[in-house]
């Protein structure tokens, strides 16, 4: 298998703490760059776990169309500002951040007080502007998740009248682009490829971490296929017919024929179906007359047995 290497040739951090990285992966066999690029991009854009603000509580507010006295932004603007916060929670549980500010004040993300499990990445992002003589009290809920989660107004846990839910975007990767370049021709004339991948994150994780997490997800996805064992299906035994379940007594055979069959451990029609005419004649004290009697009794219920073993 062709060995390739991964080089990060570029890494930048924007003013809002978003990060971008460019990676070169190669050399690869023809077609492998497309396979890797598509698979990694799909996981990067929708399969990684991230953190987001999922709900907000504002003192004195019970719906999103309200205004807060002394605050320049209305509640909808505050909700939007909180939705755009970039946070990184290391806890699997709900984390709650709080803020109490007296004006005049320019409230920013860095003013929020969380536990040590939560990091606010873009601390300079504005939240609200409080005028002199007024105050603002906020409570933010932060959770971890995957992909996009719309507001669920029927959830009893989050349906408190003063808890304003937010559509949560948990995706830490905001953009992925890749291109494929042909490299030198290998021995035998086959061209090699190189995958150039650009990954942009919101700053809650680095591009290197995003690439590693997506690769590990793909490994977990494909690993069971490497050890798959095909189990041969055993055909199910056919269900015996109702006629086969008829006990020997119900065939109304003569006493002689009945006793001979019983001594031969024949107890039902199902047992008789394993015999041929020749087999019946080999039963001790079982002559052709008794054999003919059995054949006729079986024919009355629609069952026939072969004349000889070879024709079975």
From Swiss-Prot:
Transmembrane segments: none annotated. Keywords: DNA-directed RNA polymerase, Nucleotidyltransferase, Transcription, Transferase. It holds the Pfam family RNA_pol_L. Its EC number is 2.7.7.6. One of its GO terms (cellular component) is cytoplasm. Residues 1-229 are annotated as: Alpha N-terminal domain (alpha-NTD). SUPFAM superfamilies: C-terminal domain of RNA polymerase alpha subunit (SSF47789), Insert subdomain of RNA polymerase alpha subunit (SSF56553), RBP11-like subunits of RNA polymerase (SSF55257). Gene3D superfamilies: 5' to 3' exonuclease, C-terminal subdomain (1.10.150.20), DNA-directed RNA polymerase, insert domain (2.170.120.12), RNA polymerase, RBP11-like subunit (3.30.1360.10). GO terms for biological process: DNA-templated transcription. CDD domains: RNAP_alpha_NTD. One of its GO terms (molecular function) is protein dimerization activity. Residues 239-312 are annotated as: Alpha C-terminal domain (alpha-CTD). It is an enzyme of class 2 (transferase). It catalyses: RNA(n) + a ribonucleoside 5'-triphosphate = RNA(n+1) + diphosphate. The keyword Transferase applies. DNA-dependent RNA polymerase catalyzes the transcription of DNA into RNA using the four ribonucleoside triphosphates as substrates. HAMAP family: RNApol_bact_RpoA (MF_00059). Belongs to the RNA polymerase alpha chain family. In cyanobacteria the RNAP catalytic core is composed of 2 alpha, 1 beta, 1 beta', 1 gamma and 1 omega subunit. When a sigma factor is associated with the core the holoenzyme is formed, which can initiate transcription. This is DNA-directed RNA polymerase subunit alpha. It comes from Synechococcus sp. (strain CC9605).
């Amino acid at each position: 298998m062709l060995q390739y290497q991964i080089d990060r040739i570029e890494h930048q951090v924007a003013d809002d703490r978003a990060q971008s990285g460019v990676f070169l992966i190669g050399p690869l066999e023809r077609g492998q760059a497309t396979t890797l690029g598509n698979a990694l991009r799909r996981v990067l854009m929708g399969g990684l776990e991230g953190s987001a603000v999922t709900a907000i509580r504002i003192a004195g507010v019970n719906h999103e169309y309200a205004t807060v006295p002394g605050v320049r932004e209305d509640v909808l603007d505050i909700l939007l500002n909180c939705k755009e916060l970039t946070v990184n929670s290391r806890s699997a549980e709900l984390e709650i951040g709080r803020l109490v500010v007296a004006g005049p004040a320019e409230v920013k993300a860095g003013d929020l007080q969380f536990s040590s499990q939560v990091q606010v990445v873009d601390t300079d992002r504005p939240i609200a502007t409080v005028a002199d003589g007024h105050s603002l009290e906020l409570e933010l809920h932060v959770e971890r998740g995957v992909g996009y989660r719309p507001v669920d107004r029927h959830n009893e846990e989050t349906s408190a009248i003063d808890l304003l839910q937010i559509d949560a975007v948990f995706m830490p990767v905001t953009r992925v682009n890749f291109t494929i370049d042909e490299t030198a021709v290998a021995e035998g004339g086959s061209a090699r490829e190189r995958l150039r991948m650009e990954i942009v994150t919101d700053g809650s994780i680095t591009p290197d971490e995003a690439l590693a997490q997506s690769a590990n997800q793909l490994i977990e996805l494909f690993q069971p296929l490497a050890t798959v064992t095909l189990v041969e299906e055993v055909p199910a035994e056919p269900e015996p017919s109702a006629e086969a379940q008829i006990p020997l007594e119900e065939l109304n055979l003569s006493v002689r024929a009945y006793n001979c069959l019983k001594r031969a451990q024949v107890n039902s029609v199902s047992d008789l179906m394993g015999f041929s005419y020749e087999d019946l004649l080999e039963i001790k004290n079982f002559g052709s007359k008794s054999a003919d009697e059995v054949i006729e009794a079986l024919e009355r219920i629609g069952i026939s047995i072969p004349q000889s073993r070879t024709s079975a």
